[in-house]
A protein has these predicted regions:
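The feature marks the mature, well-folded catalytic cores of soluble enzymes
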Residues: 1-254
Length: 254
């Protein structure tokens, strides 16, 4: 059984952190409706969705991916690079402790889960404004005993590594080559986004299908031409908060 931990949309999401986007008004009821539809897509993909309550004083807390990394053997609670997000970690640890032994990234290191891409036993971490060398080295020390390798990857022009690349299918990644070099990921099939859709590289592979934003029809055509099944979702309000489909859940085997 796949577990998907999510968290409700904060009433304060309009005050979210923004790095590469201009602030726009966010329709809170619509954002919450889109989030519920996203949870339904996870359930259709075979996940048992465990929705945590919204944290109205923590604007970015719907983006649970950034505060933890869950492997088969252990869960790592991160130390987010944005000061405003660090209180979120105390709220995710209890939910994870039901399933895994939990460890924590320690100061002064910083690490955002959005910078962490796992491909089998290989873990890639974006060198970003949110994840530093200390955080990456701490992650490496935690996962090495379980047989994982950790490789730091340069990125440019985007918030997180998974803004630039995500797993699209077994042995394939969806990538924006302007933001990351696909060669960093070795012998995988690289499907490039349509250059007119720079934010289109983020999809969530669950149950053999890719949960994918409706906002990127050109790139969706490329994915479908590559034989990848798409589960479309509308996350337009969450995208205004610099979020994407991987950001809104932690998916792992029970």
């Amino acid at each position: 059984m796949q577990i998907a931990i999510t968290r409700g949309v904060s009433a304060g999401i309009a005050a979210c952190e923004l790095t590469h986007l201009e602030r726009q008004p966010i329709d809170l009821p619509r954002a919450r409706a889109q989030h519920r539809a996203y949870e339904e897509a996870l359930a259709r993909a075979g996940c048992r969705v465990e929705s945590q309550p919204a944290l109205d004083d923590l604007p970015d807390s719907v983006f649970v991916e950034d505060v933890a990394i869950v492997l088969d053997e252990i869960a790592i609670v991160t130390r987010p690079g944005a000061d405003s997000r660090r209180p979120e970690t105390a709220h995710i640890a209890p939910a994870l402790s039901n399933y895994r032994r939990v460890t924590f990234i320690q100061p002064p290191g910083t690490l955002d889960g959005g910078d962490v891409l796992r491909l089998g036993r290989r873990i890639f971490v974006g060198r970003s404004g949110r994840s530093d060398e200390s955080g990456i080295e701490q992650l490496r020390a935690v996962v090495w005993p379980y047989g994982y390798t950790v490789t730091a990857v340069p990125i440019s022009g985007c918030l997180h590594l998974k803004s630039a690349v995500t797993e699209a299918a077994a042995g394939a990644v969806l990538v924006n080559p302007a933001w990351v070099d696909a060669a960093a990921f070795g012998a995988v099939r690289a499907i490039e986004i349509d250059p007119e859709e720079p934010y289109a590289a983020n999809g969530l592979l669950v149950g053999g299908r890719l949960i994918y934003p409706e906002a990127f029809p050109r790139t969706r055509q490329r994915l479908e031409a590559a034989g990848i099944g798409i589960e479309p979702v509308d996350v337009s309000e969450l995208q205004k908060a610099e979020g994407a489909v991987t950001c809104c859940s932690l998916v792992f085997s029970e």
